[in-house]
Curated annotation (Swiss-Prot):
Matches recorded under Gene3D superfamilies: 1.10.287.3510
Membrane-related topology note: Multi-pass membrane protein
Gene Ontology MF terms in the entry: NADH:ubiquinone reductase (non-electrogenic) activity; quinone binding
Record protein name field: NADH-quinone oxidoreductase subunit K 1
UniProt family annotation: Belongs to the complex I subunit 4L family.
Taxonomy of the source species: Bacteria, Pseudomonadati, Thermodesulfobacteriota, Syntrophobacteria, Syntrophobacterales
Keyword annotations of the record: Cell inner membrane, Cell membrane, Membrane, NAD, Quinone, Translocase, Transmembrane, Transmembrane helix, Transport, Ubiquinone
Cellular compartment(s): Cell inner membrane
Domain of life from the UniProt record: Bacteria
Enzyme class (EC, first level): translocase
Keyword Translocase: yes
Reactions it catalyzes: a quinone + NADH + 5 H(+)(in) = a quinol + NAD(+) + 4 H(+)(out)
Record-level GO BP terms: ATP synthesis coupled electron transport
Length: 102
């Protein structure tokens, strides 16, 4: 049962759930979590293609580690922006954040 198609379907479901979460949420923290879910779906794709199709076994793992590092940096920067927005506006809703436009 462990075929490439199984992993690709699971990765597509993760990515689509993350995309749906970004489009549906109005809370910035929820949107950040949904973005992390999308990145995990992409990581699962890299690992699945590495497992079943890559001649060099370390390439997909290295790419997945790089994406995980970028996701951690994105989460840290995103949370710091959300904290700064909360200090200024006392809310983390997207509608309130759009009031900052000049």
């Amino acid at each position: 049962m462990n075929t490439l198609t199984t992993y690709l379907v699971i990765a597509a479901v993760l990515f689509c759930l993350g995309l749906l979460g970004i489009l549906q949420r109005r809370n910035l923290v929820g949107m950040l979590i949904s973005l992390e879910l999308m990145l995990n779906g992409a990581n699962l794709n890299f690992m699945a293609f590495n497992r079943f199709l890559a001649p060099e076994p370390a390439v997909g793992q290295i790419i997945a580690l790089i994406v995980m590092g970028l996701a951690a940096a994105e989460a840290a920067i995103g949370l710091s922006i959300i904290f700064a927005l909360f200090r200024r506006m006392h809310s983390i809703n997207v509608e309130r954040a759009q009031e900052l436009r000049g």
